[in-house]
A protein has these predicted regions:
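Multi-pass membrane proteins that catalyze or facilitate reactions on polyprenyl-/lipid-phosphate substrates
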Residues: 1-278
Length: 278
């Protein structure tokens, strides 16, 4: 693992984690077609640090929302004398915490088949096909009527649908952010809120996955000599992640979310072609 290798992988992780173009798909393509070192080559701890970098990106961009969710959750349970309905209206950020918890539940259904899903990372042609499917989802979602629901009136059904889509998006090549944002738009969420909910929802998913991966990394061991390269990659992932989140927010608010579909179609087609050649 060289510094430049770490920088490139950190850049791909940071950009593709938040842009709706599938970070797992792009990292798998780099490994399968260009034989770059990734978690499967003994760099599992590096993979954990990359995801930690993107986790920090979300915390930096949405720190006000996170503080509000923590504060209002304590306030919600601290004001038990008020009727539950009144508390839900008075503390919308606390209500969003509940929706995020509900949206995370479908991920547990994937755990029994997680090993089989991970095997798909080695099938480059399949990843290309999923990138094309991601493009189709983005294109269709962008054509849907604009929704109006936010954390104040989001339904339990909306959270479960978005959560189910997040679980399906563990398939490599399907963008987690793209799939969940598209699902949010389809259920009638306001577009900027769909983006915000998708990224905040990923905090629990990424944190949970990192804890499991860190346990595996502890068993396989950590090469201390590679820590400088690992840390550089993590910082690059964090910085590029902040830029990527800002880009998604800007394009979605302007009604250009579907622009990413063209990239996914092109990347998917090229990936499928290269998989047949190499």
């Amino acid at each position: 693992m060289t510094i430049w290798n770490a920088i490139l992988l950190g850049l791909v992780q940071g950009i593709a984690e938040f842009l709706p173009i599938s970070s797992s798909g792009h990292l798998s393509i780099l490994q399968n077609l260009f034989h770059m070192s990734t978690a499967e080559d003994g760099h599992l701890f590096f993979d954990v640090l990359l995801h930690l970098g993107t986790l920090v990106s979300i915390c930096i961009v949405y720190w006000r929302d996170i503080v509000a969710m923590v504060r209002e959750t304590f306030a919600f349970f601290g004001n038990t004398r008020l009727p539950a309905e009144q508390r839900r209206k008075q503390f919308p950020a606390a209500r969003m915490v509940l929706m995020i918890v509900l949206a995370t539940l479908p991920l547990f259904l994937i755990l029994p088949i997680n090993d089989k899903v991970e095997q798909l990372y080695y099938h480059t042609f399949f990843i290309g096909l999923m990138l094309i499917l991601t493009g189709c989802l983005l294109f269709v979602a962008d054509k849907m009527p604009k929704g109006t629901r936010t954390e104040k009136n989001m339904r339990v059904r909306d959270a479960l649908i978005i959560g189910a889509c997040q679980a399906v998006a563990t398939i490599p090549g399907l963008s987690r952010s793209g799939t969940t944002i598209a699902a949010g738009m389809a259920t009638g969420l306001e577009r900027s809120f769909a983006v915000r909910f998708s990224f905040l929802m990923s905090l629990s998913a990424v944190l949970g996955a990192n804890i499991l991966a860190l346990a595996k990394a502890a068993k396989t061991g950590i090469d201390v000599s590679l820590l400088p390269a690992y840390l550089v990659g993590m910082l690059v992932a964090m910085a590029s992640g902040i830029v990527a989140i800002g880009l998604v927010k800007r394009l979605t608010s302007k009604g250009h979310f579907g622009a990413f579909s063209y990239y996914c179609w092109g990347a998917g087609a090229v990936t499928m072609l290269l998989s047949l050649i190499f």
